[in-house]
Design a protein with these regions (language model features):
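Short, intrinsically disordered, charge-balanced linker/junction segments flanking boundaries
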Residues: 1, 208-213
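Hydrophobic membrane-insertion alpha-helices, especially the h-region
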Residues: 2-16
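Active-site-adjacent loops and short helices of periplasmic peptidoglycan-processing enzymes
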Residues: 20-198, 205-210
Length: 213
């Protein structure tokens, strides 16, 4: 549920607002929106199964000032528009998507962890945790993703050994073919947490495909 909320908000905003593209799912809608057209070499049966993207305002080209971006369809992996999408850059709190993924796939969500002073010393106050507070690991995913809590990220990573957890984050990236992605901490405070726009899209697509009901 958390993954669905996070991914849905991000991609709906990116496609319909920032870039100005709209998605249509079949040839009937395509003709209705753009007028009757013939696409050479493509059967009507194939067209009915495809998605199309078009600028809602043909006179206004996308104006995205970001240094790097990748907008794609997480259902089929197709690119809609991109700019420097293979450029490696610091990813800050987007790191928490991998933190949540590794935590959900490798840790017992019902185990209890204790909030330590080291966790509370992490930069940022989101989460409103108290010293020696006992909290279920699964419950830490909510402040981690919805509040971008650095304390929650550290609490999760420290539960079974911080270095081991970060190692699992990097191993997961490697297993997904994210060759330009690396993590030095679970929160994204380190500028050495880096990736590319395209590889973050791949990670998001993986999360969508493997999210739990």
């Amino acid at each position: 549920v958390i993954f669905s909320i996070t991914i849905g908000i991000f991609f709906a905003f990116a496609i319909t607002k920032t870039v100005g593209y709209e998605k249509i799912k079949n040839n009937t809608e395509y003709n209705k929106n753009l007028g009757a057209q013939t696409i050479q070499g493509t059967s009507m049966e194939d067209l009915a199964l495809q998605n199309f993207y078009f600028l809602k305002n043909q006179d206004k080209k996308p104006n995205v000032k970001a240094e790097s971006y990748f907008v794609g369809d997480v259902e089929n992996g197709k690119m809609i528009i991109e700019k420097n999408s293979n450029k490696k850059l610091p990813i800050a709190s987007v790191s928490k998507l991998m933190t949540a993924t590794v935590a959900e796939e490798n840790l017992n969500q019902d185990e209890i962890t204790i909030i330590t002073q080291k966790v509370l010393n992490t930069y940022g106050q989101n989460g409103d945790f108290k010293l020696n507070e006992k909290i279920r690991l699964g419950d830490l995913l909510y402040p981690l993703l919805l509040e971008s809590s650095n304390d929650a990220a550290e609490a999760i990573a420290s539960h079974g050994g911080r270095n081991s957890f970060i190692g699992m984050m990097n191993e997961k990236a490697k297993s997904l073919g994210l060759v330009m992605t690396n993590f030095e901490d679970p929160s994204g405070l380190s500028i050495n947490n880096q990736s590319t726009a395209f590889e973050l899209f791949k990670l998001t697509k993986y999360i969508k495909e493997h999210r739990k009901d």
